[in-house]
Every structure is written in C-alpha cells, then in structure tokens.
Amino acid sequence: MSIADQERDDVLLRRAGKGDEEAFTLLYRRHQAALYRFALRMSGNAWAAEEIVQDVFMTLMRDPKKYDPARGTLGGFLYGVTRNRVLKHLERSPQREVPLEEKDENGSGSGIVLMDASTPAIQAERRERVEHVWAAVLDLPAEFREAVVLCELEERSYEEAAEMIGCPIGTIRSRLHRGRALLMARLEMLRDAPRRVNLPPQASVAK
C-alpha cells in the first residue's frame, strides 16, 4: 500500500476541498464500491444506485465541512448520506428491478453470483433461484430490508449496523429477526408457486 493510500480520510478530504483532484480520486476509489453495493441492494436499480452515489460525492465536494471527524468516520458519514438518498428514492419510485449481474466500474455487483453450471438447464434454474431471492429481499419493507442487507449480505456486526443506521442494537436485532422471517415466508411462497415449464423446440407434440 502506498503512502497516499494510507492517508486518513479527513486529510484527503481537506486536500480535495482545496481542489486536489488526486485526493478526491483516492477518496472516491476508497468508498465508492461499498456505497454502490449498498445502494444497489436497497434500491434494486443499478442506474439509480450509480446516480445516488455520484450525488453523494458531489454533495461532499460542494461542502466538505458537512463532515465532522469528531462525530465518526468519513465512511460512516457517506453511508448515512447514501442511506437518506436511497430512502428518498424508494419513496418516489417504489417499483424495483431484480439486480442479477449489475457491475460498477470496479467490478462490484449486487453480491449474489451466478456460478458456472454444466448445462443451460442448470444455469436457468440457478438464475431463477437468484431472481427469487432478490425479489424476496426487495419486497421487504425498507427498515427490514436494510437490516438484512447490512447484517446478512454485507456481514456487518449488530454494533456496526446500529451505528450506521443510528438506532439501538436491540432495534437492529428485532428488525433483522423480522426481516429474516418475512424473507423466509416470501421464499416459501415463491418455491411453492406453480412453475412454468418451457419445452425445448424439438420436444413438440407428435402428430
């Protein structure tokens, strides 16, 4: 790791606030991927996630003094701003897509990977399972979805999630428990739903 990479966020932010493009680039590369993944997992919309993250960084650069190092890390501050933007987006646009293989410029995607399969049929089945999982996650109310995304998909501790959201640890535990229950119920419904069978072209009915 270079000396520049080891510089503290608050030092880089002060430099970026004075017009140092290299410092801004370092900050962007350090935090962009994690913020994008969170925005994508919450919104289910790659375009919206990218727009939200870009807006978060532009807001920071317009007024760097909004971040107070005494109140926490820059990463936590950026997450909080991103979270607020995502929640506002969800209020305006409740409809969501299922993000399967969306990637950002650093190759960071939704976090659910479609593994290579030996046959097209297996690939299709695995894709369907991933679609079901994402549909179930995105169907959760925002507060429960956020707990599932942070603690399950991003594997953050209860303490980290509580600090990021700004609520007691007990609230995180309760939301995660409820979110898991709703998620499992939704997946059960999807699993038990009648499945459409598509026959290959050569499997036509004999005349």
Model-derived features with residue positions:
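Helix-turn-helix DNA-binding module
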Residues: 134-171, 185
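Amphipathic, Lys/Arg- and hydrophobic-enriched alpha-helical face
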Residues: 28-46, 63, 79, 137, ...
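Internal acidic/polar
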Residues: 5-6, 96-126, 157, 197-206
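Arg/Lys-rich amphipathic alpha helix in sigma70-family domain 2
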Residues: 62-69, 80-101, 126, 178, ...
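Structural recognition of an alpha-helix C-terminal capping motif at a helix-to-coil junction
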Residues: 37, 51-58, 72-84
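Residues within the DNA-recognition helix of helix-turn-helix
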Residues: 31, 175-178, 182
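Sigma70-family region 2
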Residues: 17-18, 41-44, 55-73, 92-94
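Short, charged helix-capping/linker segments at alpha-helix termini
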Residues: 1-3, 15-26, 36-55, 160
